[in-house]
C-alpha cells in the first residue's frame, strides 16, 4: 500500500505556496507585460534601436522566469496528483515513485522562486561590478586578492553570469593588487551585493621560508550597473583622466596597447580603470559607466547609512568591517555576520559561495 496522504498533503501545500507567490509577484500583470514585450520584439524595426531591443530581451527573460515557473508549478501539481491517482488505481509502484520524484522537483522550483523575494531592492535585478583590492601585507596579501578574484570568477561561471575582467593590476611578485570584474545576468547585483566588505585570510604563507602563519586582508566592493537614464551629474572639471599601457595577467582578455584608461573623480577620490578593449575610446566609455554606477551606489549608501554597514567610499572600507574569515590551517571558513561556517575550504575557494550568500540575504543584510 502506498503512503498517499503525505504526497497529497505536500501537493496541497505546494499549491497554496504557489498561489501566495502568484499574488506577491503580481502574476497577471507580469503575464500581460510579457505579451506586450513579445509583441514589441516581433516588430521588424525593433533592432533600429539596439539598446532598447536588448533591454526588452532582458525584460522578457526576467518575466518568463516568473510567469513560466508559476505556470509549471500550477500545472505540475495537477499532473502529479493525476499520477498518484493512476498509481493507486493500477497499484503501480513505479508510477507512484515517479509522482513522488516529480513532487520533489516542483518543491525545488518553488523554493527557488520563493528565494527571489529576497531580491526586492531597486537594482537587485541589475548587472554589477566587483572591485577587489589587496590589503597591506605585500605578496601574501596580493596572492590572497588573486584567490578571491578566482573565487568570484568561478562562482560567476557556475551561475551563468559571464564574468568579464575589466581591469587587473599585477602584484609585485605574485597575485594582484586590484581587479574589477563585471557580472552580466539576471539578479547579478541581488546575489552579490552582500559580498561587500573585508575578507580575512589566515594560513601558513607559501612565501615565508619559515612557514609561519600570516593574516592577510582583501576588500571587496560590489555595485550595480545603472541605466543611462538615471541622472548622475559628473563635472568634467572634477575628473583626472590618465592613459597608460595595459598590464596584468589577463591573457587574451586584457589588451597590451596604450589604450588603458584610468579616471579619478577628484571630489570623492573614486578611481575606475578599464583595459579590456584595444580602443581607448571604448575603454573611456566603460570607465564613465563604472564611475557613474559607483557614484550612484555610494550616494545610495550615504542615504541609507543607518541601515548599511558599508562606508561612503571604497577606500573607507576599513579592515574592521570584516565579513568572512578564511582560516585554512584549521580548515574553517566562517561568515562573521550570520555565523554560517564550513570546513570544506577548497570548495568555497572554488566558488561555492551560495550557502554564505543565501544566509546573508535571508538575514536581511
UniProtKB/Swiss-Prot annotation:
<dbReference type="InterPro" id="IPR004374">
    <property type="entry name" value="PrfB"/>
</dbReference>
<keyword id="KW-0648">Protein biosynthesis</keyword>
<comment type="function">
    <text>Peptide chain release factor 2 directs the termination of translation in response to the peptide chain termination codons UGA and UAA.</text>
</comment>
<comment type="similarity">
    <text>Belongs to the prokaryotic/mitochondrial release factor family.</text>
</comment>
<keyword id="KW-0963">Cytoplasm</keyword>
<keyword id="KW-0488">Methylation</keyword>
<dbReference type="GO" id="GO:0005737">
    <property type="term" value="C:cytoplasm"/>
</dbReference>
<dbReference type="Pfam" id="PF00472">
    <property type="entry name" value="RF-1"/>
</dbReference>
<dbReference type="InterPro" id="IPR000352">
    <property type="entry name" value="Pep_chain_release_fac_I"/>
</dbReference>
<protein>
    <recommendedName>
        <fullName>Peptide chain release factor 2</fullName>
    </recommendedName>
</protein>
<dbReference type="InterPro" id="IPR045853">
    <property type="entry name" value="Pep_chain_release_fac_I_sf"/>
</dbReference>
<dbReference type="Pfam" id="PF03462">
    <property type="entry name" value="PCRF"/>
</dbReference>
<dbReference type="InterPro" id="IPR005139">
    <property type="entry name" value="PCRF"/>
</dbReference>
<dbReference type="GO" id="GO:0016149">
    <property type="term" value="F:translation release factor activity, codon specific"/>
</dbReference>
<feature type="modified residue" description="N5-methylglutamine">
    <location>
        <position position="252"/>
    </location>
</feature>
